[in-house]
Design a protein with these regions (language model features):
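Short intracellular "coupling" helices and adjacent cytoplasmic loop segments at the cytosolic face
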Residues: 110, 276-288, 305, 432
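Short amphipathic coiled-coil heptad-repeat segments
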Residues: 142-148, 273-277, 295-302, 598
Length: 641
């Protein structure tokens, strides 16, 4: 065991964060700390590292072990470059190397006992340097920086010029390079693109120390952790397994506890009814038996009713009208912020009902495309047009569509003046804003709260074409699942940018990967994208070996993606047709199976089986149904392949 938290207690006034919870982390164990927004995850991490004092209990770190903590906000030395700042994580090793080089120079001018003394020091230092893998220090720094999405050209960038997200990546790099015995990470995937998240997953999987991580990224948690510690309603509960295992076990546990509670309540009601009946007999024996049952009830240990969180927002997305089949047509679009080219000459179409995800590395122009489509930015060249009857609903990750000086209530009432006060409060309550909360200024809200206001406006817009920029940012896992459910039931069209692979996998019917200034299309969800990308990578690798010219192979791959655009559109249309046919077949099978079951019930009724004419009619109908079902089952199997 490397870390143990015993009977931890913490409250801020009347708000209880933890009420006597305990958990532990074993050596080399990878654990997640999960819970709704505001449950106290970050507060608990700060208690563990000593930034916040617990009201009770204690935190024990095994003697001699080191702990590293990545907070959501970090301080930086603005006078250094990115590389210099990250290099400070290896200060001890670099100082050791400096001493070794100095002794090497000294020994050139020494002899006798003094030389022997310095030689012993030199051997001791070089042995320690090798143990710490000092000779690979610089390459390790470079590898971590590249893994976190920095190019070598960016290594010399001054820290003072970096964005908040870039500074967070620098801090994460420093922490990883210090290699403490246990890492505490608070939302480490924030500001990372898909490639960097994948790199971090692999790094942490191979990390020799222990890990306690706060994250809302389910793919990430599923791949990295083997234990989940839940903080909810002031209680700490430990579940073995990854996030999916935790979610299943939690639901099973909740159902079991509710069943136990309901069974006991039913038993209590039954006993009380029996007691009342016995007393109504008004006989000595009956009264004694009633008293005996009352004593039994008094001794019964009450099962506590499972507490349920009432913190789930309610989101329903319904378009007010149906758009034309062609929702968006983009032709030869280009954009650059010199000297950087984001994308050039891109063309694509989006049809009604599609859910399209745009993915790609940070800085490739994904959000820029959405801003161009919403006329926030202008393209350098090219054009786009919307189809007939298209109404856009826009979700901006930076929430520029919100007004910082307005209250939440004003934000809704000004945009939707037809809603009365009661209707506005009802909408806001669905997004967890109640009482005086509705009079908070937008500028004073957290990122998650602003996200909920933006989602409320999106719901009220009744748009039939949703354009969403990182819609899951700042949402807890439950809220993400609610958004996924709403989008999957949405009958309109969706175009979004996201780094949340689980979200993409659940909601996308098509993925456009922005790579090498153009789009590569994948008609499917994220799992399909990974599968096809591996095939493309293998094909690219084979081409490279055959031609021994990687640049030529890259050009060929990009050219192929452009040449196959028409084929991809045809394949997409074919897939939509197959999906529609598959759905119709399933629905018809369901109708026939229901009717078949009805016939079975009817033929078992006396008024039917004694009526030969009715029996023959039903038998004939049943035979026709069976024949049609046989055909439909075969068709379903073909369409499912």
């Amino acid at each position: 065991m490397i870390l143990a938290c015993h009977n931890i207690k913490k409250a801020f006034g009347e708000e209880v964060i933890v009420s006597g919870g305990s958990f532990h982390i074993e050596d080399h164990e990878k654990a997640a700390l999960v819970g709704p927004n505001g449950a106290g995850k970050t507060t608990l991490l700060k208690m563990i590292v000593g930034e916040i004092q617990a009201d009770g209990g204690n935190v024990v770190l095994t003697r001699g072990k080191t702990m590293g903590y990545l907070a959501q906000h970090q301080d930086m030395n603005n006078d250094r470059t990115i590389y210099q700042e990250v290099r400070t994580a290896k200060a001890d090793i670099l100082d050791m190397e400096r001493q070794i080089r100095e002794i090497e120079q000294e020994m050139k001018h020494l002899s006798g006992e003094r030389l022997e003394e310095r030689m012993n020091t030199y051997q001791r230092l070089t042995a320690a340097f090798e143990r710490e893998n000092g000779y690979a220090c610089e390459s390790e720094i470079t590898g971590v920086l590249k893994g976190l999405g920095f190019t070598e050209e960016e290594f010399a960038k001054p820290v003072a010029t970096l964005s908040g997200g870039q500074k967070t990546r620098v801090s994460l790099g420093k922490l990883l390079l210090t290699k403490p015995d246990i890492l505490l990470l608070d939302e480490p995937t924030n500001h990372l693109d898909l490639n960097s998240i994948s790199w971090l997953e692999t790094y942490l999987l191979n990390y020799p120390g222990a890990l306690l991580i706060v994250s809302h990224v389910r793919y990430f948690l599923n791949r990295v952790v083997t234990k989940v510690v839940e903080i909810e309603l002031g209680k700490l509960t430990t579940f073995m397994g990854n996030y999916t295992d935790y979610a299943k076990k939690k639901e099973m546990l909740r159902e079991a506890r509710m069943k136990e509670y309901l069974n006991q309540q039913q038993e209590i009601k039954h006993q009380e009814a029996v007691i009342e009946k016995l007393r109504s007999f008004n006989r000595e024996k009956s009264i004694k038996r009633a008293e005996s049952r009352e004593k039994m009830l008094d001794k019964m240990t009450p099962v506590e009713k499972p507490m349920e969180l009432h913190t789930d927002m309610h989101l329903t997305l319904e378009p007010s009208c149906v758009s034309g089949n062609d929702v968006l047509i983009v032709e030869h679009l280009s954009k650059a912020f010199p000297p950087q080219i984001l994308f050039e000459n891109i063309s694509f179409e989006i049809k009604r009902g599609e859910h399209v995800a745009i993915i790609g590395d940070n800085g490739t122009g994904k959000t820029t495309i959405l801003k161009i489509l919403n006329q926030v930015l202008k393209a350098d060249s090219g054009s786009f047009r919307l189809g007939s009857n298209v109404k856009i609903g826009y979700y901006d990750q930076e929430h520029h569509v919100l007004h910082m000086e307005k209250t939440i209530f004003q934000e809704i009432s000004d945009d939707y003046p037809n809603l009365n006060n009661t209707q506005i409060r009802k909408v806001l309550a669905a997004f967890l804003f109640t009482g005086d909360d509705v009079f908070k200024l937008i500028g004073d809200l957290s990122g998650g709260e602003r996200g909920r206001v933006s989602l409320a406006k999106l719901m009220l817009s009744e748009a039939n074409f949703l354009i969403l920029d990182e819609p899951t940012n700042h949402l807890d896992i439950t809220s993400k699942e609610i958004l996924e459910h709403a989008l999957n039931n949405y009958t309109g069209t969706v175009l979004y940018v996201s780094h949340d692979r689980y979200f993409i996998n659940q909601t996308a019917t098509r993925i456009m990967d922005l790579v090498n200034h153009t789009f590569v299309n994948y008609i499917g969800n994220y799992d399909y994208y990974l599968e096809k990308k591996e095939e493309l990578t293998a094909a690219y690798s084979n081409t490279s070996r055959l031609e021994n010219n990687s640049s030529s192979a890259t050009t060929d791959l990009a050219s192929d993606s452009k040449l196959s655009w028409q084929e991809q559109k045809e394949a997409q249309a074919k897939e939509r047709k197959r999906a529609n046919e598959f759905k119709k077949t399933e629905e018809r099978i369901g109708v026939l199976e229901d009717r078949s079951a009805e016939i079975d019930i009817l033929m078992a009724q006396e008024e039917v089986y004694t009526n030969s004419v009715k029996c023959q009619e039903l038998a004939k109908e049943r035979a026709e149904i069976d024949a049609e079902l046989e055909t439909l089952y075969e068709k379903w199997e073909e369409l499912a392949e």
